[in-house]
Regions:
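N-terminal structural segment of carbohydrate-active enzymes
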Residues: 1-76, 81-92, 127-132, 143
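An active-site-proximal structural segment forming one wall of the substrate-binding cleft
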Residues: 19-23, 66-70, 90-92, 96-99, ...
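Active-site beta-loop-alpha junctions enriched in small/polar residues
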Residues: 33-35, 79-81, 165-167, 193-197, ...
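Conserved alpha/beta catalytic core and glycan-binding cleft of carbohydrate-active enzymes
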Residues: 86, 90-102, 107, 149, ...
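Glycan-binding loop/region signatures in secreted carbohydrate-active enzymes
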Residues: 92-141
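Active-site neighborhood of glycoside hydrolase catalytic domains
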Residues: 125, 130-201, 205, 244, ...
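A cross-family glycoside hydrolase active-site/sugar-binding cleft signature
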Residues: 29-31, 75-79, 163, 191-193, ...
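Short, well-ordered coil/turn segments that N-cap beta-strands
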Residues: 24-26, 68-72, 156-158, 185-189, ...
């Protein structure tokens, strides 16, 4: 929900599985489920603990069991570019400053940390002080994140949807990520949140697919046509969407299908809205 915690657990998702099966669902992509101080859970506090509000690790394990029993895969959302301020390393850094062994886990510009002001003295996602950016080039940070990725695959999760992976520009990290994930489960699915041209990410050494936002823009332009509130749609991050007639829509689809290798096209996370 946009504001507040309105209920709902992973136990509830498992309970609704018959309904999802009736819809023909074969995979469930969950937004972040790890312990967090935010209702949307992009402010990760503990990467090894499913939020108790959602039922904790036990609820995820049960959901995986019942989903797999019906041939349904479960994909988690991985937020590896930044953490919440409640993450243990950032908490230690706030308490101990330059003496903290975690001082190289973040891009700190000065001490003491100014974590509760509009202008933090550390790098943060889009300048939001609630989301300090991890320093992935630090070996300990890198290994921590790779261990998280591998842990949940071995737990039984079927893949990862990666939040803002382009903001971790070092391609060697994502190559190592793929090696660790595929080493735990060669069939695991890795999809990145890349909004535009994604060819560098789809060469077989990083992601299996990306979120197909260009397709979403085309579908909205065709289905919504002149009735679409394009100003509102632009606020979603999709940009300005122009109406498409059938022939133009067909040409747009042909262009999208031709951008990548056939095996990548078939694996894309296609978004219809």
């Amino acid at each position: 929900t946009l504001r507040g915690f309105k209920g709902g657990t992973l136990w509830g998702v498992a309970e609704k599985l018959p309904y999802l099966l009736d819809l023909g669902v074969e995979a469930i992509y969950l937004n972040p489920v790890f312990a967090s101080t935010a209702n949307h859970r992009y402010h990760t506090v503990d990467y090894f603990q499913v939020d108790p509000i959602l039922g904790g690790n036990e609820a995820l394990r049960y959901l995986l069991e019942v989903a797999h029993a019906h041939g349904v895969r479960v994909i988690l959302d991985g937020v590896f570019n930044h953490t919440g301020r409640g993450f243990f390393a950032f908490q230690h850094l706030m308490e101990n400053g330059e003496q903290s062994p975690y001082r190289d886990w973040y891009h700190v510009k000065g001490f003491p940390l100014k974590a509760y002001t509009a202008h933090p003295n550390y790098e943060a996602w889009w300048g939001n002080p609630e989301l300090p950016k991890l320093k992935v080039e630090t070996p300990a940070v890198r290994e921590y994140l790779l261990a998280v990725a591998e842990h949940w695959i071995r737990f039984g999760v079927d893949g990862w949807r990666l939040d803002v992976p382009n903001e971790i520009p070092d391609p060697t990290f994502w190559r190592e990520f793929r090696q660790r994930v595929k080493g735990a489960n060669p069939e695991a699915y890795i999809v990145g949140e890349i909004w535009e041209e994604a060819d560098p990410w789809l060469q077989g050494d990083m992601f299996d697919a990306v979120m197909n936002y260009p397709l979403a823009r085309a579908v909205l332009g065709f289905v919504g046509g002149e009735a679409l509130d394009r100003d509102l749609a632009a606020q979603t991050g999709l940009g300005r969407i122009e109406p498409l007639q059938a022939l133009a829509f067909s040409h747009r689809l042909e262009d999208l299908f031709g951008r990548y290798r056939p095996e990548v096209v078939r694996a894309q996370m296609n978004l219809l809205t």
